[in-house]
Amino acid sequence: MPLFRKPAITPALALSKYKAGDYFTLPIVSTQTGNANSGFLVAFPLFFPNISIDRIGCLVTVAGGVGSLGRMGIYNASTTAAYPSSLLIDGGTVSVSTTGNREVTVALTLAAGFYWLAYLADTVVTSAPTMRQQNVCINPFAPIVSTNTLFQSGSGVRAAGVASGSLPATFPAGATDLGGTGGIHIIYTRIA
C-alpha cells in the first residue's frame, strides 16, 4: 500500500497539508553561496506527493552582469539509476542580474514520485551571479542503498558545457556526482 494512503504508518511530516502559496524544496540544514558559471547545469532529486506547482525559483545573493539569465526546469527521474533522465518542463529564464528570489511561472501537476529540480546558467554577461546553495541537507531518501551515492547524500549532479537557449531534452550523461559536498543551487517550487 502506498505510504501516503495509510495514515497509521505515514510520518507526521508527510501528513502535513500542502497549501496553495507554500514553497516546497529539499530540507536543508545549512547553506553556502557559489557562482552560477556559464554552461553549468545542476540538478538535485526531490520526492513530490501528488501536487500542482505554479512557480520554480532560486535565490540570487550577488547579482550577475546586466543581461545574465538563469533557466530553471524539472527532469524526470531515471528508472534505472539515481540520475535525472528526460526533461519534464523547461520553465524558461529569469534575470539573475538583480538579487533576491527569482521565479518562473509554470502550470504543472506532478504525480507522486521522484523528480530532479534543475538550474542552468543560461547566459552570463561579464560576471556570474552568486546563488544560495545547499551545504548540508537532510537526506529524505534514507535508507536507500545504491552503488550511486546521490540518494545517500541527498545532493545532486553538475554537468558542464551545456549550451544556452533551452534545457537539454535528456540530462547530459557523465555529470559530476557532487555527493555530500554541497554546491547545488537551491531550487524551490511553489504549490498552486
Describe these PLM feature segments.
Residues 1-15, 190-192:
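Short, intrinsically disordered N-terminal pre-domain segments
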Residues 7, 63-67, 176-179:
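A short beta-turn/strand-edge loop motif at beta-sheet boundaries
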Residues 22, 42-47, 90:
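Short amphipathic
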Residues 27-39, 93-98, 178:
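Extracellular beta-rich ligand/substrate-recognition surface
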Residues 36-39, 47-55:
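Extended extracellular/luminal ectodomain segments enriched in beta-structured repeat modules
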Residues 51-62, 117:
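A short beta-strand element within beta-rich, extracytoplasmic domains
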Residues 67-147:
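Aromatic- and Gly/Pro-enriched, solvent-exposed loop/edge beta-strand patches characteristic
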Residues 121-192:
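Short, surface-exposed beta-strand/loop patches at domain edges
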